[in-house]
Curated annotation (Swiss-Prot):
It comes from Ehrlichia ruminantium (strain Gardel). The active site is at K79 (charge relay system), S158 (charge relay system), S182 (acyl-ester intermediate). The keyword RNA-binding does not apply. Allows the formation of correctly charged Gln-tRNA(Gln) through the transamidation of misacylated Glu-tRNA(Gln) in organisms which lack glutaminyl-tRNA synthetase. The reaction takes place in the presence of glutamine and ATP through an activated gamma-phospho-Glu-tRNA(Gln). GO terms for biological process: translation. Belongs to the amidase family. GatA subfamily. Keywords: ATP-binding, Ligase, Nucleotide-binding, Protein biosynthesis. HAMAP family: GatA (MF_00120). It is an enzyme of class 6 (ligase). It catalyses: L-glutamyl-tRNA(Gln) + L-glutamine + ATP + H2O = L-glutaminyl-tRNA(Gln) + L-glutamate + ADP + phosphate + H(+). This is Glutamyl-tRNA(Gln) amidotransferase subunit A.
């Protein structure tokens, strides 16, 4: 048998059914791996909670087989942005370092109710703001991959702990969040599958807010089939979330047929950057390889234009920063957050927020407050919302002539941990993922191969609203050609 940790979720499920090993044995193997990990992926470990859940899973596997699901006894990790009952939830910020929720977020509850075993909470960029997982009060996360010259690289962000844990075989799958690419970009950097569903497909109840009109739960796994299995239980309408979509959730696994003959795949010219920037050539070559794979399977390739793409990144950072400045205003040390006491209330606010919020979070709060200020609201925030509609309309028009859109996920491979990127360069890591987020569309990142530095490169498939099954199927076709690059 393969190393128990390196099995896919589907393979783990099959072996649990066959009694090749128990859920407790599977869970203990992961606990041992976590205790010895050097990636700094897990920040809160819950071994007793996990073993109790595994014992319950073993009981179901033996005595209540009608209750078995695809995730019964499967060990998973949870990004520390999702509330977990009686388990610390910090968003990796000092201001919430001691916060323990009294309830589970909806998506966590649905995972646990479906039989998944929670191993603990995963590191992330503070309040999900970042592309490298270096903005965490618990320290940076290390990518399991290293460059060919031995240099350590970042896992991406903000779900860097989730992507590193899955790629490093510390858990079978992980829950992440995606606001502008925070599931897809780290998945690309770590060579795994990362899926962001349609906005509203998964409940945001109990998920610590960054930008409420963009935030969406997502999954990170090692295979496309696993992504379908993990996504299934967390979808569905929730009365606790006013943005939750009240529509039926299909069985995603049924959509993975590997049949794409006649499907029209859009290739947006605006995503081709290698003509201007030589450093993006490797990604463009892999993009062409992915196009060829889909052509081989009978798909029709269609050149399309998304003319407002160039505005997406600045629009995104205005909108998400504005929403963050509003959402994070609650952390003042009185109702929420670790308080720094002072005799003067204004000084207390200043010390509490100044000492307990990180540099990137404060930067975005300031950007957002500026964009929302009375003198600049129309010039920045209102205009950004108007352009967001134009970006969305580009996709709506394109989906009248194509079924899916294929792009790179990130412009380059993962960068070195000790590489000091300026803020703008860091933001550019999300240049390909942000447009789909602004439009609220589902998108998946799938590994396509390795760079010359032996680091993962990935492609992104964007689908029409609520067509998660379709993007899973396209990703599965690419996976058929590339295999599992983690091997």
């Amino acid at each position: 048998m393969k190393d128990i940790l390196k099995l896919s979720i589907a393979e783990m499920h099959e072996n649990l059914i066959k009694k090749e090993f128990s859920a407790v044995e599977l869970t203990q193997a992961h606990i041992d791996a976590i205790n010895n990990e050097q990636l700094n992926a897990f920040i809160t470990k819950t071994p007793e909670v996990a073993l109790n859940a595994a014992r319950k899973a073993d009981h179901i596997l033996t005595h209540e087989q009608d209750k078995i699901t695809s995730l019964t006894g499967i060990p998973v990790g949870i990004k520390d942005l999702f509330c977990t009952k009686n388990i610390k939830t910090t968003a990796c910020s000092n201001i919430l370092r001691n916060f323990t929720p009294q309830y589970d977020s909806t998506v966590v509850k649905r995972l646990i109710d479906d039989g998944a075993v929670m191993l603990g909470k995963l590191n992330m960029d503070e309040f999900a703001m970042g592309s490298s997982n270096s903005n965490s009060c618990f320290g940076p996360v290390e990518n399991p991959w290293t460059r060919a010259d031995g240099v350590k690289v970042v896992p991406g962000g903000s779900s860097g702990g989730s992507s590193a844990a899955v790629a490093g075989f510390l858990c079978a799958g992980a829950l992440g969040s995606d606001t502008g690419g925070s599931v897809r970009q780290p998945a690309a950097f770590c060579g795994i599958v990362g899926l962001k569903p349609t906005y509203g497909r998964c409940s945001r109840s109990g998920m610590i807010a960054f930008a409420s009109s963009l935030d969406q739960a997502g999954v990170l796994t090692r295979t496309v089939k696993d992504a379908a299995l993990m996504l299934q239980p967390i979808c569905g309408y929730d009365t606790q979330d006013s943005t939750s979509a009240n529509i039926t959730t299909p069985r995603f696994l049924d959509s993975i047929t590997n049949i794409i003959k006649g499907k029209r795949i859009g290739i947006p010219k605006e995503y081709e950057l290698s003509n201007k920037y030589k450093e993006y050539e490797e990604v463009s070559e892999m993009w062409l390889k992915g196009i060829k794979y889909l052509e081989n399977e009978g798909a029709e390739i269609v050149n399309i234009s998304l003319p407002h793409t160039s505005y997406a990144l600045p629009v995104y950072y205005i909108i998400c920063s504005a929403e963050a400045s509003s959402n994070l205003a609650r952390y003042d040390g009185i109702k929420y957050g670790t308080r720094v006491n002072s005799d003067n209330i204004n000084e207390m606010y200043e010390l509490t927020r100044g000492n307990n919020l990180g540099t990137e979070v404060k930067r975005r709060i300031l950007i957002g407050a500026y964009a929302l200020s009375s003198g600049y609201y129309d010039a920045y925030y209102n205009k950004a919302q108007c352009i967001r509609r134009l970006v969305t309309n580009d996709f709506v028009e394109s989906f009248k002539s194509v079924d899916y859109i294929l792009t790179p996920t990130a412009p380059k491979e993962a960068f070195a941990m000790d590489e000091q990127l300026d803020t703008l360069t860091m933001y550019l890591n999300d240049v390909f993922t942000v447009p789909a987020s602004l439009a609220g569309l589902p998108a998946i990142s799938i590994p396509i191969g390795l760079s010359k530095n032996k680091l993962p490169l990935s492609l992104q498939i964007i689908g029409n609203y609520y067509d998660e099954g379709g993007i899973l199927n396209i990703a599965s076709v690419i996976e058929k050609y590339t295999g599992n690059i983690l091997k």
